[in-house]
Amino acid sequence: MTQHDPVARQASISEEMHISAEFDAEYEIERRVAFLANYLRSSGLKTYVLGISGGVDSTTAGRLAQLAVERLRAEHYDAHFVAIRLPYGEQKDEADAQQALRFIRADENLTIDIKPAADAMLAALDQSGLLYKDESQQDFVHGNIKARQRMIAQYAVASARAGVVIGTDHAAESVMGFFTKFGDGGADVLPLTGLNKRRVRAVSKALGAPEALAHKVPTADLEMLRPQRPDEDAYGIPYDAIDDFLERKPVSDAARETILRFHEVTRHKRALPYTPFDWPVQTSGD
């Protein structure tokens, strides 16, 4: 029945995304700092690693990570947080990223330019004879390469520092599948899970983040043909509608249909790789 009832599907998806009926920013800060501290200690590893873009998600996750390692050190556990800038050449909103770093106050800051590696991979694909439908498709592929190159860099640092990679995925992005599979979607821990966009903003403000970062227009900024394209432009609906949907509030039929469609077609992005034991298979003898 749930499959065909849009309101029931809304409730089911809200539960899937771990959206609680009640929200208290201070409680969520403590819950997520404790989670990060407990996870790192139990893993036996020493370092958290996170890419900082200058958006509210990485700003929030970064400050939570720094608070977690400071808590661990106060408890005599050796812990360290490395914040990494991962620009593609010159980033247009670099000033925002630097403001985020000043707010986060990470133990260590690194900068790794992904442009040479990302461009080299695109050139290698071109040399292989791979053809694209059009320039837009090539730009999209290049954008995904950038996201995955950032993942490679973060895991390289984590490998060198006995570290764990933090991801910034939250419920509003997750329900829409708005991340690159094995790119920004590749991480070990996701401390923002269970928060929609407005709640991430509320947590960031409770942490003391600058107002300009807390309310910055979100953009993945992966495509060169559409630089700084807002997330909401890609969705076709505003974050407020997605957040209302996740909080089980009334939304327009058009918004609900858009969210349900995105959720369905991006289902594979939220799952581990499928195996013959996960998926029904019909053989020629069936």
UniProtKB/Swiss-Prot annotation:
Pfam families in the record: NAD_synthase
UniProt keyword Metal-binding, yes or no: yes
Binding residues annotated for deamido-NAD(+), in chain numbering: 148, 181, 188, 268-269
CDD domains in the cross-refs: NAD_synthase
Record-linked NCBIfam families: nadE, PRK00768.1
Family: Belongs to the NAD synthetase family.
PANTHER family found in the cross-reference section: NH 3 /GLUTAMINE-DEPENDENT NAD + SYNTHETASE (PTHR23090), NH(3)-DEPENDENT NAD(+) SYNTHETASE (PTHR23090:SF7)
Quaternary assembly: Homodimer.
UniProt-recorded name of the protein: NH(3)-dependent NAD(+) synthetase
Protein's organism: Paraburkholderia phytofirmans (strain DSM 17436 / LMG 22146 / PsJN)
